[in-house]
């Protein structure tokens, strides 16, 4: 008998405020054409004043619980992947736990920037496989709009706010690649590249800081490492790119997404795309794309999915799962 972490429900939340590229033209020296050409982004959502990452996460969590037909106290573990927690501590996860009215279980944050949701899924899978939890609510939530340097026109136009969530539940499988649930994970990091993508603030500086990125270098590493980790995870599952129904990538940049799909020899009509509507929502981007992909009728039960992401650290990884 093999225990698999199977998707029971999915949901997402986007703040009400939609910021089209045309609005950013008034803030920085840029154009709609420039942004679209370099990133594929047309619009993004920004959180309202006073609206926090944990607020977004709780809304997405409720949507995922409703989709699963579960109540908060049916959950054993709650994991939030975020780099923009409300406070230095306590964790965003415990704040969401309180907001949902959960009176049992345990909650914690995972911080791997844009790769955070992949890391969180791997943690949830390990908890379920080891028997430490049966139902895990995994959330990716970010308010990156608050980290932007609005004088850095190459970076500030790329990011948005949002949250997505999955409910994973342990279920018996046959131990084959035909099982539903998470089939394989692959995680990596290399701190030698920390200066390529980081925020120049934190407890040691006494300020929140702003996001700093060497875009060309990040692009180069992303295209190379994302295809590699996806192939590794597929190999662990005994599968190949030809078996993939959908790539659900981190929605950072359309050029990165396209180049990675090309390296994997997967056509773009088998890639879930939301970057045009959400921008880069960091750890929220993959669960947002999963939720939107299901709502569109693209992702169906039994489909084989590969999710992959890379973020500051550098940290990167992938998950192969059957929906």
UniProtKB/Swiss-Prot annotation:
Top-level taxon in the UniProt lineage: Bacteria
Listed GO MF terms: 3-oxoacyl-[acyl-carrier-protein] synthase activity; beta-ketoacyl-acyl-carrier-protein synthase III activity
* Catalysed conversion reaction: malonyl-[ACP] + acetyl-CoA + H(+) = 3-oxobutanoyl-[ACP] + CO2 + CoA
The record's Gene Ontology cellular component field reads: cytoplasm
Listed as disulfide-bonded, the cysteine pairs are none
- Does the keyword Lipid biosynthesis feature in the UniProt annotation? yes
Cite the annotated pathway: Lipid metabolism; fatty acid biosynthesis
Q: Which UniProt keywords apply?
A: Acyltransferase, Cytoplasm, Fatty acid biosynthesis, Fatty acid metabolism, Lipid biosynthesis, Lipid metabolism, Multifunctional enzyme, Transferase
Q: What is its EC number?
A: 2.3.1.180
The first-level EC class reads transferase
Q: Which GO terms describe its biological process?
A: fatty acid biosynthetic process; secondary metabolite biosynthetic process
Q: What is its main location?
A: cytoplasm
User: In the UniProt record, does the keyword Manganese occur?
Assistant: no
Q: Where in the cell is it found?
A: Cytoplasm
Q: Which residues carry out catalysis?
A: 114, 250, 280
Q: Where is this region: ACP-binding?
A: 251-255
The family database entries (PANTHER family) matched by this protein are listed as: 3-OXOACYL-[ACYL-CARRIER-PROTEIN] SYNTHASE 3, BETA-KETOACYL-[ACYL-CARRIER-PROTEIN] SYNTHASE III
How is this protein organized at the quaternary level?
Homodimer.
Homology family: Belongs to the thiolase-like superfamily. FabH family.
What is the name of this protein? Answer: Beta-ketoacyl-[acyl-carrier-protein] synthase III
To which species is this protein native?
Cereibacter sphaeroides (strain ATCC 17025 / ATH 2.4.3)
